[in-house]
Amino acid sequence: MIEFSHATFAYEGSSTPALRDFSLCVGAGECVVLCGKSGCGKSTALRLVNGMIPNFYDGSLSGSVSVAGRDPFECEIWELAGIVGTVFQNPRTQFYATDTTSEVSFGCENMRLVREEIARRVDEAFAQTGIAELKGRSIFELSGGEKQAVAFASVSAMSPSVYVLDEPSSNLDLRAIDALGTIIASLKRRGATILVAEHRLGYLDGVADRAVLIEDGRLVCEMSLEDVRRMSREDRARTGLRPLRSELSHDLESRAMLPGKSTDRIVCDDVGFSYRKGAGLALGIDRMDVRMGSVTAVLGRNGAGKSTFSRCLAGLVKPNRGKLLGRSGPLSERERLAMSYVVMQDVNHQLFCPSVREEVLLSAGKGAISGLEEVFGHLDLEGLEERHPMSLSGGQKQSVAIASALASSKKVLIFDEPTSGLDYSHMLEAARLFQAIAEDGMAVLVVTHDMDLVAECCDFAVVLERGAVLREGPVDASFLVWAIQYLRRDTSNGNEREGATA
């Protein structure tokens, strides 16, 4: 169904090939995972399959690529669209409508299906992706994970024979990732051919037929997921592969009371916020402490209020009620803005400069930066300093945004899904950097679905449910076990709120 034969591709303006002598066959009905570190060439391989290369990305190709017997370089993209459906890493790049129902039906309308068939497919797609409650919602009101799920539903409605998925789990919570695995398994049972670029392989366990490891554009080896399961932690860090299941074997004794941790904190006192007058509260926090000198995880399902809370804390929005208190009393929006730096969930919103170096220097303002080259080294950005940020992979863009936050020297650093698109080794490096920042007395908040990251570096965690604090406390093994179980189960009709544990 898909065949690469000695394919070498270099983007226009680049002398370094993104793929080198790449050969791979994917049979009809197979599920194959492309894996490897950020920037290794996974997305380039996908673009050669779905026609994005050469229709949207120019460059030179030697060797050949074939999809269902067609050469993507020789046929029109609309011809491939009837065969290949794609879910991109950033769902915003494939939205054309303003509401979810119109978005999911858009592809079917372009296929000129009759109204009744479109309605049937749309209902089926919402049901299969487990997002029936999002039908008819505004795209602009959705969380990042909800947007990704809608993007998947819009492709599913078109019933392509080949699915190309570019890190589809990157913005999803644990329950949604489990649901995604179920969806992909269902597609495979129906005979679809699936090519996935991923760092997280756990949800594909039992679904993927094999994993293909790419390093520096070259196919290094093919593995079963059982081979991945047997990999050591060091081998996963070298190859960028996540563990199949979250590891809880690290030293998780509470780090909150270790010597050197600051006792300063920002107190959220009866903080409430709603997006529209007369609407229900998107955030309703009775009491929560943000500790300086610690790394705090903000957890919860998609739409739980995590990003809304981070905006309130950073002074980007004004709460309808309540106060945020510092050492000297209430903190105004202006004061919180001055002391905070936010790395957004979609980092494309905050990349402005023509080079990586200028982007990071912009965040530093007039202040001097020490150790900038060391930061580039830690985040694997060496050699990319003069590249345009928008030319980088999703994981590399995320690393640039993290480097910019470090350069800002703000007291409160808020990272919204900082490991989205990051491979295992870069996640570990980000975790070490977050700990180092906290040791310097700053507050680090990590809004995340990534429990591997939480286990690696977080001192405290708060779990939000419908905008309120469900549980708060130090990160230890028992908390992680509870959090993973909670985030994987459906509590839409339950009342599980607990008192604060710290």
Functional labels for PLM-detected ranges:
Residues S138-L142, E146, H388-L392, Q396:
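Conserved ABC ATPase signature
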